[in-house]
Amino acid sequence: MKLFTKIFSPLIHHQANADALLLSEQLNRQDHHALIFPDFLQSITLDYSLISLRKLDHYLHKVRVHFRLANQQPQFAQQHTKLIDEMTRIVLRVGAYLGETIRQQNKKWIWIENKEEIYTESDVLKTTVLILTDHDNLTSPMQ
């Protein structure tokens, strides 16, 4: 069993690492899927450094203020859905960038996939979550 894990484990994690890297590179996307405040994101050098994380923290402060104000306004269901979608894109992309920064600063860390099932009253939603691990610790920067 150890031989199997030693040979195939890096192959399995390689895809999760590639997926997270791709998602982290979506931070300054400039199309209809761009995040809010794209000019602010463009001003940040996204080089997976600790300095870039500090600047992203300023971005997240602007985002929190924006969503706090947006939630104080009356909304139709479509507007609310749009806000949730935007918030989800921000959490996933910034979380992936945070995880990639950790991974690039310390090569012991890798992404792994965790399959989850969420039970609702009428359905079971199956999803895969990327989790960062150094084989002793786990963290979920995208949640």
What do these predicted ranges mean?
Residues 86-124:
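Aromatic- and glycine-enriched beta-alpha-beta binding-site module
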